[in-house]
């Protein structure tokens, strides 16, 4: 219950190295 790292393969978003941090 904080943040999680999701690969762009799961969510088509690009920020750094093909991953982004989603605040929950």
UniProtKB/Swiss-Prot annotation:
Domain of life: Bacteria
GO molecular function: oxidoreductase activity
Keywords annotated in UniProt: Molybdenum, Oxidoreductase
Keyword Oxidoreductase attached: yes
Cofactor: Mo-molybdopterin cytosine dinucleotide
Record text on cofactor binding: Binds 1 Mo-molybdopterin cytosine dinucleotide (Mo-MCD) cofactor per subunit.
The protein's role, per its UniProt record: Active with aldehydes and formate esters as substrates.
Name of the featured protein: DYE-linked aldehyde dehydrogenase, alpha chain
